[in-house]
Swiss-Prot record:
Protein localization: Cell membrane
GO terms under biological process: axonogenesis; modulation of chemical synaptic transmission; regulation of neuron migration; regulation of neuron projection arborization; regulation of neuron projection development; synaptic membrane adhesion
Tissue: Highly expressed in the thalamus, with very low expression, if any, in other tissues.
GO molecular function: cell adhesion molecule binding; cell-cell adhesion mediator activity
Protein name per UniProt: Netrin-G1
Function field: Involved in controlling patterning and neuronal circuit formation at the laminar, cellular, subcellular and synaptic levels. Promotes neurite outgrowth of both axons and dendrites.
Region (NGL discriminant loop III) residue spans: 273-275
Annotated disulfide bonds: 33-50, 72-92, 80-88, 182-206, 297-306, 299-315, 317-326, 329-354, 364-373, 366-384, 387-396, 399-417, 420-432, 422-438, 440-449, 452-462, 467-480, 474-486, 488-497
UniProt organism field: Homo sapiens (Human)
Gene that this sequence comes from: NTNG1
Gene3D superfamilies: Galactose-binding domain-like, Laminin
Subunit structure comment from the entry: Interacts with NGL1.
Stored Pfam families: EGF_laminin (PF00053), EGF_LMN_ATRN (PF24973), Laminin_N (PF00055)
Keywords of this entry: Cell membrane, Developmental protein, Differentiation, Disulfide bond, Glycoprotein, GPI-anchor, Laminin EGF-like domain, Lipoprotein, Membrane, Neurogenesis, Repeat, Signal
Length: 539
């Protein structure tokens, strides 16, 4: 019973989690513009596509209202609650902070009680239209990564248009129309994002989904970014490679999610009835408590950092690019036409770095050790060619094998690299470390591997001692010659002269011993001698 209850609770938790987290938290790993790799030429840079993290872009915008004096409170006025036209004791006064509703309250911290919001003047000049343009400007190209969400403190407007600009507000194009009656307001058939497809995802639609009359729980308007992404990446955005492929190859799709400015055009406030109640015009106004815009600086996949300085956003460009959006090659790096980075292949993409111009390579940043460079397309990098003065590496900044860095010389000094001079007999190879120490064979020591460790002697390299005057003594009168062999008397042989020569010939007991000493151990010989010289015993 307990097991089945646990499984039921677990299944419920999985279901709730999937509902609460419909999209992946991480969309792609493009957080590095370059990394170092090792090649035969030493360490070189490997470049990859990169982009800044998605963030709350409302922190960096400037807001402008048109007409400029449309905000309530100057002069002070009272307004009615829309749900109850007889509750007209709410006051807006721009000179009193507690009663003021300036535009910046659309972007402040949410969750306060009571809530903060911007509010327009009431529709006291009816039948003249009450219309407001709210322009959000970044002075920078940004890419939208999440839904645009507008939360109204009052009822949602009966008519509204969300517009975008790609040229800093010089021209505008509609993003989406909102109305209680699309056909009447904009001569368009009502649609929702669910009616679109991959082929019609760029269609500008009018929706009635968010423009119903005032209700307590119906204050939010969306512009659905993620639902449009889902046409390519799937309903849970798992197939990001498909979306990235479309963004790479379809400029119109990429531009659709790119803006420099947004404009909210409020054309008709929430009326709540068919006709406007001219006796209670103080109940008609616009009030917005929050606007959410999430995205990232557009850096054309050439930067991971976007700096906000002096009220301006700027990409910190990599890949030898420059410009506010990294949209051109740096001076002297026009070796091929500028190109944006590419998301593909997943997961690192393609950097499409700018390369040096042939006429501007100069000394190729080779510290004076070469005047030639070569571009390696596979690595998207430029390396020095034919490094002189025993140097090597991408910028001739390393020493060739068999040489080490002269710590007292600058990188551009001809004597920056010193030969290792490893002893060929004592070292494993001719290379040394950064301090000039060679790698020695067993029994060998010294910076150049030309000295022997104790117990070893030099003989075409260090060899273990065969004999010495300390532990490995030559026996039977033998003498040690240069620690490499014992010089034995004529009757003895062996490494330490420890064997009788006749033992090897097998003739120690024959008459032809030629004066060989009697066969036997030293103890037996001593006993025989003692017995031969002793006096006879008397009984």
């Amino acid at each position: 019973m307990y097991l089945s209850r646990f499984l039921s609770i677990h299944a419920l938790w999985v279901t709730v989690s999937s509902v609460m987290q419909p999209y992946p938290l991480v969309w792609g790993h493009y957080d590095l513009c370059k990394t170092q790799i090792y090649t035969e030429e030493g360490k070189v840079w490997d470049y990859m596509a990169c982009q800044p993290e998605s963030t709350d872009m409302t922190k960096y915008l400037k807001v402008k209202l048109d007409p400029p004096d449309i905000t309530c409170g100057d002069p002070p006025e009272t307004f009615c609650a829309m749900g109850n036209p007889y509750m007209c004791n709410n006051e807006c006064d721009a000179s009193t902070p507690e009663l003021a509703h300036p535009p910046e309250l659309m972007f402040d911290f949410e969750g306060r009680h009571p809530s903060t919001f911007w509010q327009s003047a009431t529709w006291k000049e009816y039948p003249k239209p009450l219309q407001v343009n709210i322009t959000l400007s970044w002075s920078k190209t940004i890419e939208l990564t999440d839904n645009i969400v507008i939360t109204f403190e009052s009822g949602r407007p009966d008519q509204m248009i969300l517009e975008k600009s790609l040229d800093y507000g010089r021209t505008w194009q509609p993003y989406q129309y909102y109305a209680t009656d699309c056909l009447d307001a904009f001569h368009m058939d009502p649609k929702s994002v669910k009616d679109l497809s991959q082929h019609t995802v760029l269609e500008i639609i009018c929706t009635e989904e968010y423009s119903t009359g005032y209700t307590t729980n119906s204050k939010i308007i969306h512009f659905e970014i993620k639902d449009r992404f889902a046409f390519f990446a799937g309903p849970r955005l798992r197939n990001m490679a498909s979306l990235y492929g479309q963004l790479d190859t379809t400029k119109k799709l990429r531009d659709f999610f790119t803006v420099t400015d947004l404009r909210i055009r409020l054309l008709r406030p929430a009326v709540g009835e068919i006709f406007v109640d001219e006796l209670h015009l103080a109940r008609y106004f616009y009030a917005i408590s929050d606007i959410k815009v999430r995205g990232r600086c557009k850096c054309n996949l050439h930067a991971t950092v976007c700096v906000y300085d002096n009220s301006k956003l700027t990409c910190e460009c990599e890949h030898n690019t420059t410009g506010p959006d990294c949209g051109k090659c740096k001076k002297n790096y026009q070796g091929r036409p500028w190109s944006p980075g590419s998301y593909l292949p997943i997961p690192k993409g393609t950097a499409n770095t700018c390369i040096p111009s042939i006429s501007s390579i100069g000394n190729c940043e080779c510290f004076g050790h070469s005047n030639r460079c070569s571009y390696i397309d596979l690595l998207n990098t430029v390396i020095c060619v034919s490094c002189k003065h025993n140097t090597r590496g991408q910028h001739c900044e390393l020493c060739r094998l068999g040489y080490f860095r002269n710590a007292s010389a600058q990188l551009d000094d001809e004597n920056v690299c010193i030969e290792c001079y490893c002893n060929p007999l004592g070292s494993i190879h001719d290379r040394c470390n950064g301090s000039g120490f060679c790698e020695c064979k067993t029994g060998t020591t010294g910076p150049k591997c030309d000295e022997c460790l104790p117990g070893n002697s030099w003989h075409y390299g260090c060899q273990p001692n065969v004999c010495d005057n300390e532990l490995l003594h030559c026996q039977n009168g033998g003498t040690c010659h240069n620690n490499v062999r014992c010089l034995c008397p004529a009757a003895y042989t062996g490494i330490l002269c420890e064997k009788l020569r006749c033992e090897e010939a097998g003739s120690c007991g024959s008459d032809s011993g030629q004066g060989a000493p009697p066969h036997g151990s030293p103890a037996l010989l001593l006993l025989t001698t003692l017995l031969g010289t002793a006096s006879p015993l008397v009984f």
